[in-house]
């Protein structure tokens, strides 16, 4: 309940701030709100704004969502090994030492997030630490560190911002045309009817275009996973990376809770593969073997 309340409060605050900023931009530039240029300004502001704010808050939101505990001082040999391994890999790829956290989950999962290469987070589940060998866990960590080194979080945010901008702009532009056409053809409807037409059409189009755009963003996400696997193979050797993926394939299939779960994926092929953020495990293993 607290997490939902925090999410709603954050979104409300973002919407209020965006509205204020948008009105200031219109006032300073003299752009008319109903014009195409005004619509484009609004689409860019809202399209990129949400993505950038989510990126800036990603570390704290990720830790809160999984109940992760940051390792400040290692309390046991496993935590000491975890910090030492991440530190060594970070030095190898030339990034700052990420914050390292552990969260309680029986699934073999890990994820990386953060707005900067030198201010990032790597979190691993207790299930991964208990179920994988050190070599396999090392490969998983290398995969996450490679995501950070490649700037995947920032790249995905920028891509999502561009996609959001096009979805908002096209939806509102078409809705403007439709509402203008219907209001001129239908007598007695007035401004209220025109607004309702605009609202309904723009909402439906944003949902439809957003769904279609998700195929593109998920394709890009799968593409970056192959790069992270290759980066991990360079850090620790491809046999360790293959062994980690084989362990995941043999393990219990995990159900993801959002795009931040960067390593736990379902290896089963299905018709929904185009909407998966990760390639099937078999394809990732084959790609590594062909390196």
Swiss-Prot record:
Cofactor: Zn(2+)
Primary subcellular site in the record, as a coarse category: membrane
UniProt-listed Enzyme Commission number(s): 3.4.24.-
Subcellular location: Cell inner membrane
Gene3D superfamilies (UniProt xref): Metalloproteases ('zincins'), catalytic domain
Pfam family, one: Peptidase_M48
Record's keyword annotation contains Lyase: no
InterPro entries: HtpX_protease (IPR050083), Pept_M48_protease_HtpX (IPR022919), Peptidase_M48 (IPR001915)
Gene Ontology molecular functions: metalloendopeptidase activity; zinc ion binding
Note on cofactor: Binds 1 zinc ion per subunit.
Domain of life of the source: Bacteria
Disulfide bonds: none
Enzyme class: hydrolase
Transmembrane segments: 4-24, 36-56, 151-171, 199-219
Keyword entries, A-Z: Cell inner membrane, Cell membrane, Hydrolase, Membrane, Metal-binding, Metalloprotease, Protease, Stress response, Transmembrane, Transmembrane helix, Zinc
GO cellular component term, pick one: plasma membrane
GO biological process: proteolysis
Chain sites annotated for binding Zn(2+): 143, 147, 225
Membrane protein topology class: Multi-pass membrane protein
Active site location: 144
Keyword ATP-binding belongs to the record: no
Family indicated by similarity: Belongs to the peptidase M48B family.
The protein, known as: Protease HtpX
Organism classification: Bacteria, Pseudomonadati, Pseudomonadota, Gammaproteobacteria, Vibrionales
């Amino acid at each position: 309940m607290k997490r939902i309340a925090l999410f709603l409060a954050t979104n409300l605050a973002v919407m209020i701030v965006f509205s204020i900023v948008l009105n200031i931009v219109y006032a300073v530039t003299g752009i008319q709100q109903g014009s195409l240029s005004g619509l484009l300004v609004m689409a860019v502001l809202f399209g990129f704004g949400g993505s950038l704010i989510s990126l800036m808050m990603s570390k704290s939101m990720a830790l809160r969502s999984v109940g992760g505990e940051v390792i400040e001082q290692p309390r046991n040999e496993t935590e000491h090994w975890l910090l030492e391994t991440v530190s060594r890999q970070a030095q190898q790829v030339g990034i700052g030492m990420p914050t390292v956290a552990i969260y309680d989950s029986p699934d073999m999962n890990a994820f990386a997030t953060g707005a900067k290469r030198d201010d990032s987070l790597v979190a691993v589940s207790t299930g991964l630490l208990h179920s994988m060998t050190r070599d396999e866990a090392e490969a998983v960590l290398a995969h996450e560190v490679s995501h950070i080194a490649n700037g995947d979080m920032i790249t995905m945010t920028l891509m999502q911002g561009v996609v959001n901008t096009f979805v908002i702009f096209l939806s509102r532009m078409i809705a403007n045309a439709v509402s203008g056409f219907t209001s001129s053809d239908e007598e007695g409807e007035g401004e209220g009817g025109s607004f309702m037409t605009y609202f309904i059409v723009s909402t439906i189009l944003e949902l439809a275009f957003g769904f279609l755009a998700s195929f593109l963003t998920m394709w890009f996400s799968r593409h970056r996973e192959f790069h992270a696997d290759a980066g991990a193979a360079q850090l620790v050797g491809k046999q360790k990376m293959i062994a980690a993926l084989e362990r995941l394939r043999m393990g219990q299939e995990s159900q993801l809770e959002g795009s931040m779960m960067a390593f736990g994926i379902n290896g089963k092929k299905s018709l929904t593969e185009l909407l998966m953020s990760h390639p099937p495990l078999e394809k990732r293993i084959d790609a590594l073997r062909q390196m």
